[in-house]
Amino acid sequence: MISPDPRPSPGLARWAESYEAKCERRQEIRESRRCRPNVTTCRQVGKTLRIQQREQLQRARLQQFFRRRNLELEEKGKAQHPQAREQGPSRRPGQVTVLKEPLSCARRISSPREQVTGTSSEVFPAQHPPPSGICRDLSDHLSSQAGGLPPQDTPIKKPPKHHRGTQTKAEGPTIKNDASQQTNYGVAVLDKEIIQLSDYLKEALQRELVLKQKMVILQDLLSTLIQASDSSWKGQLNEDKLKGKLRSLENQLYTCTQKYSPWGMKKVLLEMEDQKNSYEQKAKESLQKVLEEKMNAEQQLQSTQRSLALAEQKCEEWRSQYEALKEDWRTLGTQHRELESQLHVLQSKLQGADSRDLQMNQALRFLENEHQQLQAKIECLQGDRDLCSLDTQDLQDQLKRSEAEKLTLVTRVQQLQGLLQNQSLQLQEQEKLLTKKDQALPVWSPKSFPNEVEPEGTGKEKDWDLRDQLQKKTLQLQAKEKECRELHSELDNLSDEYLSCLRKLQHCREELNQSQQLPPRRQCGRWLPVLMVVIAAALAVFLANKDNLMI
């Protein structure tokens, strides 16, 4: 028997190994295959195709080169070799002979496909040779790429006169000088050189685009090659495994033939047939069980399908209900948001109302304190009013007394005036009598004169005394009249103050009643000026009363 390979299978090793180990393994495989001869049929076919492709590209580039420089080649027919066309171009008047420089330039410029294939062969020298099918695919792809290029033997047409470049000579006898342009640094550059540079740049851009396209194609081919190499490796590994199994079976058969005789082999075969029959019966029984289980499973599957259909219907119903509930939830969410916004607004209003309420409560407390102070002041004013009323009563009593005294004085003055008048009348009568006596007694005796003068002197003295008393009484009367006038003025002032205080008290009581009836929010604006006016009036009355009492 063949001993099994102790090494793990390459597939498992590839899955288990790391990236660095994989890179090292691939490098070792490349190094081991580099010395091996690399000559196969598919490589030779690819090489011929690449050579053909290279020649076609070179011819197409030469044609484009001649077209861009507005040169003309002689058409000798399709049967002639293209080298003869290159060696023998037609020379006409007005044309420039074609030099061998374009050909050398075209040969120097290596085709991008050749460069890329060279790099690919350098980068992947140790890869396993792909199968023939992959080579066919590559050959077909390259042939299709080559078919897209312009044909090989297309004749170069003569360009018209108005399309000729700066390298062609004019057909007429006149010779024109080449135009030139001056750069910023003072260097003169010919127009044809600028045109040549632009043509070279366009050609380089076109080559770059072609190279990019070829790189994309090569990347696609590389991915296909990698996949094909992986599949070929897997096939070879499977083939090696099968070969190993066949060898192990052959070894087992060989050992069995050496151990057992033909009769023993028959016995073993009979035993194996019995085992086979028993295994077949067991397999049939197991198959029947499996079929029964399958039937049960199918029945369960049908029942589950029915339940699934019912569940799907219910699911659709629940889905419709869910969508309806979702819409309701959205509407409720919008309503909830609106209510929350309203609630925030109301909370802000409530906070403002609370702050206002606090302010109003503070104002109300302040007003209550002021009300209490005003009530205390009103009580004080009422006491002052009572005192004022008592003072007025005293003053009225004094006024009555003064009026009574005035009346008594008036009566006495009248009496005194009557006495004075009577005395004046008596004096007049006495004077008349004296005049009559003087007329009746012509001789005047000096002895009797002093006796007569004495009564006259006594009468005059009495008159002067009466006059003095009368003047004193009149002065007293005038003083009493002044006092009465002053008392009348004071009484009028006190009555006016009393009436003003009564009016203010009534006004304060009315405002207090209104403040008790109206809400506190409306009273705040009206209370303050009224209270200030009442306080000012009460202070004025109080100060006036103090001044009067001091007087």
Swiss-Prot record:
According to the UniProt entry, the coiled-coil residues are 240-436, 464-506
Write out the annotated subcellular location: Cell membrane; Golgi apparatus membrane; Lysosome membrane; Mitochondrion outer membrane
GO-annotated cellular components: Golgi membrane; lysosomal membrane; mitochondrial outer membrane; mitochondrion; plasma membrane
GO terms under biological process = cytoplasmic pattern recognition receptor signaling pathway; positive regulation of type I interferon production
* Chain ranges passing through the membrane: 527-544
Cross-referenced CDD domains = CC1_T3JAM
State the membrane topology.
Single-pass type IV membrane protein
Q: What is the effect of changing residue 529 to S?
A: In a colorectal cancer sample; somatic mutation
Q: Could you tell me which residues belong to the region Disordered?
A: 73-95, 140-178
Question: Topological domains (Extracellular): residue ranges?
Answer: 545-551
Q: Does the keyword Calcium apply?
A: no
Q: How does it assemble?
A: Interacts (via its coiled-coil domain) with TRAF3 (via isoleucine zipper). Interacts with MAP2K1. Interacts with PPP2CA; this interaction targets PPP2CA to the lysosomes. Interacts with TLR4. Interacts with MAVS. Interacts with TBK1.
> Briefly, what is this protein's role?
Adapter protein that plays essential roles in both innate and adaptive immunity. Plays a crucial role in the regulation of thymocyte development. Mechanistically, mediates TCR-stimulated activation through recruiting MAP2K1/MEK1 to the Golgi and, thereby, facilitating the interaction of MAP2K1/MEK1 with its activator BRAF.
Q: What is this protein called?
A: TRAF3-interacting JNK-activating modulator
Lineage of this protein's species? Eukaryota, Metazoa, Chordata, Craniata, Vertebrata
